[in-house]
Amino acid sequence: MKIKILFFLALPFLAYASEHGGTNYDIVERTLNFLLFFAILVYFAAKPLKALYQSRIDRIANKLESIQEKLRESKAKKDDVLKRVEEAKQNANALIETAKKEAVNLAAKVKKEAQNDIANIEKGYKEQKEFEERKMTKGVVNEILSDIFSSDSLKVDQKELVNIILKKVS
């Protein structure tokens, strides 16, 4: 009995909830139209959109590859420059060592030549001194002898002649 009462009480609600015959919602047809439109759109626009997207991917990949190539080239150049700098440092050190050795050798050579020149000058001085002494001695002897031989009044014996020569020489 209670079910019958509930049925009669719910009947007006069910009557108002039913269709009045005025508005008909066509959700199924609209959904099918949308899906059909989307399928046609995908069919015609998918290939150009996919090609556009793929060309963009290719451009980015090419740009990335060119950047990586430039990076590799710059690294190779950097390594080459670093090698050259290291070689230049080694060459500079070798040149410095060679210059130091040459300076030492040149100083020794100049010193040796100076010593040889000094020895030659001293030798020349001694020879010149001896030559001048002999020349002076000859001159003195010639002068004494010419004095002795020019004056006939003076007769000198050998001892006196030696004494006179010794006095003139000293």
From Swiss-Prot:
The chain crosses the membrane at residues 3-23. It is found in: Cell inner membrane. The keyword Ion transport applies. GO terms for cellular component: plasma membrane; proton-transporting ATP synthase complex. It is a single-pass membrane protein. Keywords: ATP synthesis, Cell inner membrane, Cell membrane, CF(0), Hydrogen ion transport, Ion transport, Membrane, Transmembrane, Transmembrane helix, Transport. Pfam families: ATP-synt_B. One of its GO terms (molecular function) is proton-transporting ATPase activity, rotational mechanism. Belongs to the ATPase B chain family. F-type ATPases have 2 components, F(1) - the catalytic core - and F(0) - the membrane proton channel. F(1) has five subunits: alpha(3), beta(3), gamma(1), delta(1), epsilon(1). F(0) has three main subunits: a(1), b(2) and c(10-14). The alpha and beta chains form an alternating ring which encloses part of the gamma chain. F(1) is attached to F(0) by a central stalk formed by the gamma and epsilon chains, while a peripheral stalk is formed by the delta and b chains. F(1)F(0) ATP synthase produces ATP from ADP in the presence of a proton or sodium gradient. F-type ATPases consist of two structural domains, F(1) containing the extramembraneous catalytic core and F(0) containing the membrane proton channel, linked together by a central stalk and a peripheral stalk. During catalysis, ATP synthesis in the catalytic domain of F(1) is coupled via a rotary mechanism of the central stalk subunits to proton translocation. Component of the F(0) channel, it forms part of the peripheral stalk, linking F(1) to F(0). This is ATP synthase subunit b. It comes from Campylobacter concisus (strain 13826). The lineage of its organism: Bacteria, Pseudomonadati, Campylobacterota, Epsilonproteobacteria, Campylobacterales.
